[in-house]
Curated annotation (Swiss-Prot):
Listed SUPFAM superfamilies: PE/PPE dimer-like
Pfam families with a match to the protein in the record: PPE, PPE-SVP
Protein name: Uncharacterized PPE family protein PPE23
Family: Belongs to the mycobacterial PPE family.
InterPro entries: PPE_C, PPE_dom, PPE_sf
Superkingdom as given in the UniProt entry: Bacteria
Miscellaneous remark of the record: Was identified as a high-confidence drug target.
GO biological process, one term: response to host immune response
């Protein structure tokens, strides 16, 4: 059995953290166990057979690589935690009792990560040192076929040494075998000395306790007390409350309908009052128009009084207006008050009457406004037609 045989006795997949621990520990135990024995007392067949029959330095190198990976992960975690804590505390993004409590709990854990990463790196270096020691010892070890050939030659020389002729050859063969013995012993002792540091591993400390175990108990107690304080909620008649709530909603809907109906009645009343006011306004407008029509009728009655005076006649000469003979009254017709009143009372004739007062040439001639009196604007009621009297000529 060689020193590196115990490496595979754990049956752990290479590359895992457990393989690292098992591999290094097994090699250390194997070397420590054989260091108590005398490698010089063992023939070269045993020492060479052990060195050549094992898996070699492969498990040790795999363990070293696994330790390197674990150290890198621990170091990265420690760096990330430290950067996050530094950013939170230095930038003042989170300050107060909760922040202080978190920092006090995390900083010890960050320190543990850094320490464990360093120990993992040391374990990796020790595993690589053990692998290097094995390679050196393997190079010094006599190959088993050479030892077997020496033993075969010795047996042949001994069997054919009938007359002592093979004695010098037998001595030479025995001397070579002794050299093989010494060489294997030296290789094993050197391997044990070089691999001794792998037997001294710094123990890993468990991670610090960053939580308060009593706080969990206090939290459970507080929750239980809170449930006890609010146990009255179980005695509430939720079904009755739901029933009363539905009754309240129904009453609210009824009140809403009443308010809606009242609003409709109010709107109808306002529309009724508005209609009455509109009817009153129309009646007043009709009365004003009727009064205006009555004033016009009074004017026409005054117009009907024209010509009611006695007829007077006289014999005289006709007056001359140019080459035309005209009645004497045309030159200066008397302006009777009745004619002025009638002219002013009729809107269509008023302008003609005023023009007749200022005219000197044709005072007794019929005015054009009289002929246009029939074309006045339409009035409500019976339409009146007024015909002007023509004055007697001659």
């Amino acid at each position: 059995m060689t020193l590196d045989v115990p490496v595979n006795q754990g049956h752990v997949p290479p590359g895992s953290v457990a393989c690292c621990l098992v591999g290094v520990t097994a090699v250390a135990d194997g070397i420590a166990g054989h260091s108590l024995s005398n490698f010089g007392a063992l023939p070269p067949e045993i020492n060479s057979g052990r060195m050549y029959s094992g898996p070699g330095s492969g498990p040790l190198m795999a363990a070293a690589a696994a330790w390197d990976g674990l150290a890198a992960e621990l170091s990265s975690a420690a760096t990330g935690y430290g950067a996050a804590i530094s950013e939170l505390t230095n930038m003042r993004w989170w300050s107060g009792p909760a922040s202080d409590s978190m920092v006090a709990a995390v900083l010890p854990f960050v320190g543990w990560l850094s320490t464990t990463a360093t120990l993992a790196e040391q374990a990796a270096m020790q595993a690589r040192a053990a692998a290097a020691a094995f390679e050196a010892a393997f190079a010094m070890t006599v190959p088993p076929p050479a030892i077997a050939a020496n033993r075969t030659l010795l047996m042949t020389l001994v069997d054919t040494n009938w007359f002592g002729q093979n004695t010098p050859a037998i001595a030479t063969t025995e001397s070579q075998y002794a050299e093989m013995w010494a060489q294997d012993a030296a290789a094993m002792y050197g391997y044990a000395s070089a691999a001794a540091p792998a037997t001294v591993l710094t123990p890993f400390a468990p991670p610090p306790q960053t939580t308060n175990a009593t706080g969990l108990v206090g939290h459970a107690t507080a929750v239980a007390a809170l449930r006890g304080q609010h146990s009255w909620a179980a005695a509430i008649p939720w079904s009755d409350i739901q029933k009363y709530w539905m009754m309240f909603l129904g009453a609210l809907a009824t009140a809403e309908g009443f308010i809606y109906d009242s609003g409709g009645l109010t709107l109808n009343a306002l529309q009724f009052v508005g209609g009455m006011l509109w009817s009153t306004a129309l009646a007043e407008a009709g009365a004003a128009e009727a009064a205006a029509g009555a004033g016009g009728a009074a004017g026409w009655s005054a117009w009907s009084q024209l010509g009611a005076g006695p007829v007077a006649a006289s014999a005289t000469l006709a007056a001359k207006i140019g080459p035309m003979s005209v009645p004497p009254g045309w030159s200066a017709p008397p302006a009777t008050p009745q004619a002025q009143t009638v002219a002013r009372s009729i809107p269509g004739i008023r302008s003609a009457a005023e023009a007749a007062e200022t005219s000197v040439l044709l005072r007794g001639a019929p005015t054009p406004g009289r002929s246009r009196a029939a074309h006045m604007g339409r009035r409500y009621g019976r339409r009146l037609t007024v015909m002007a009297d023509r004055p007697n000529v001659g």
